[in-house]
A protein has these predicted regions:
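N-terminal secretory targeting modules
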Residues: 1-101, 156-159, 170-226
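Short, well-structured alpha-helical segments in soluble
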Residues: 148-157
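Generic structural signal for small/hydrophobic residues in well-ordered secondary structure
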Residues: 107, 146, 161, 296, ...
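Short, amphipathic alpha-helical "lid/cap" segments that border enzyme active or binding sites
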Residues: 143, 147, 282, 286, ...
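Membrane/wall-proximal cationic-aromatic binding patches
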Residues: 35-128, 132, 147, 237-271, ...
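Serine-dependent acyl-ester chemistry module
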Residues: 167-330, 334-337, 342-353, 364
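Histidine-centered active-site loop/cap adjacent to the catalytic His
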Residues: 15, 31, 338, 361-397
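A conserved hydrophobic secondary-structure block that centers on an alpha-helix together
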Residues: 132-143
């Protein structure tokens, strides 16, 4: 009986090609599912996938209700509850504006997200001091917006002013459209920004004046509308555009420097504190903070920059012996800017309370997952530590 004929070379090649195509199709399908369904829920800042229909609805919803330079809050919302007529957060213990012993500017770590309005650490500090501390924090702000808000707020009569810097601000300061870092695609989240000119001086880049068509154009061709935004899609540190082939998109994501940094256990913004980072974020943030302090001095105030570490900052400190924002502390000290890093005192305070391993997690509103903003109990500890520092420096009697 004759042996069966061996498959021809052509048939073998066709078989292998079919298997490879099937594997590629499976890989492409899995990549598409991951990029479209999983990643947007866990790390939306990594992807750029504008929804034009949703953008039209977002435009109609806000109807021009924004600040022409800072983006948010709008002039109307800036003096509406939960803010008072001066733009400060309502303080039930000291509800009457005026005669504040101190004021504070910054982002949600100053405002006090994740907890009741009366329980933010600024409000707890106010109760401990027995005087009004006017809270001008705004969620989502960068150091740049906090500074501009302070320059505008000429009715701030407090003799002492705090500038809170959450480490992620270093990224926000080189960004104009918050949608590039995971915020909703709304015109509200569009802002101006500072750059440093050739002499190292701050120069303000205006917020683009857009109509609805211009806003849609921003989503479709961001570089033509906000060319000074460091985090433009498909740049070194910007989000990756979601497009076919999805496997290639996934590969580009894997090569993102911010993602590689995150895999080391450090916060995604850590690299931005390097002096040689292409964003120039360190020098810019230091210049903005210095400008804030000099403006305070010009107005007869005393200013203190306060770092507001998140849980990731404590992890980096434990592993490396210093936080990721250490270069900013050094840069501000070199500029003779008074800056306070409460982390060592917070660690000591937590140790004295015998919270045990990973005690820094108890500072935050979500201690089980070790994230969020300062919680009620943690905010009380932050307020204690800052109060001691204010008194040590003679800023508060």
């Amino acid at each position: 009986m004759a042996a069966p004929a061996a498959p021809s070379i052509a048939r073998r090649l066709l078989l292998w090609a079919s298997m490879i195509l099937i594997l590629l199709a499976i890989l492409e399908g899995a990549s598409a599912v991951f990029l479209k369904s999983v990643l947007p829920k866990t790390a939306r800042f990594l992807l750029w996938n504008p929804d034009i229909a949703a953008a039209h609805k977002a435009w109609a919803k806000v109807a021009g209700n924004w600040d022409d330079e800072l983006g948010w809050p709008s002039p109307r919302e800036a003096v509406m509850p939960p803010r008072d007529a001066t733009g400060a957060k309502l303080n039930p213990d000291f509800p009457q504006p005026g005669q504040a012993c101190a004021s504070a500017y910054g982002d949600s770590f100053i405002w006090g997200d994740d907890i009741p309005l009366k329980d933010g650490w600024i409000e707890q500090l106010s109760r401990k001091l027995g005087c009004r501390v006017a809270n001008y924090g705004v969620s989502g702000y960068g150091t740049d917006q906090a500074y501009v808000r302070f320059t505008r707020n000429t009715q701030d009569e407090a003799p002492v002013v705090l500038l809170g810097i959450f480490p992620e601000n270093v990224i926000r300061n080189v960004n104009q459209f918050r949608a590039f870092i995971g915020f909703a695609q709304s015109p509200v989240w569009l802002k101006g920004r500072f750059v440093l000119d050739g002499a190292g001086k701050l120069q303000w880049i205006n917020r683009p004046r857009l109509d609805e068509a211009g806003f849609i154009h921003l989503l479709r061709d961001p570089a033509s509308v906000v060319p000074h935004d460091y985090l433009l899609p498909d740049t070194r540190d910007g989000p990756v555009s979601l497009r076919f082939p999805y496997t290639l998109t996934l590969a580009r994501l894997a090569l993102m420097p911010r993602l590689r940094v995150r895999f080391t256990g450090s916060p995604t913004w850590s690299d931005f504190f390097r002096a040689n980072h292409p964003s120039g974020a360190l020098a810019l943030t230091a210049a903005i903070a210095e400008a804030f302090v000099r403006e305070a001095e010009r107005r007869g105030k005393r200013a203190l920059v306060v770092m507001l570490p998140d849980a990731g900052s404590f992890r980096v400190r434990a592993e490396l012996g210093r936080p990721e924002y250490a270069p900013l502390l050094a840069a501000l000290a070199a500029k003779h800017v008074n800056v306070f890093d409460p982390a060592p005192a917070l660690i000591a305070a937590l140790g004295a309370r015998s919270f045990g391993a990973r005690s820094y997690c108890t500072l935050y509103a979500k201690p089980a997952s070790c994230n969020g903003h300062f919680g009620i109990a943690g905010g009380g500890i932050v307020a204690d530590v800052v109060m001691v520092e204010l008194r040590r420096r003679g800023l508060i009697k």
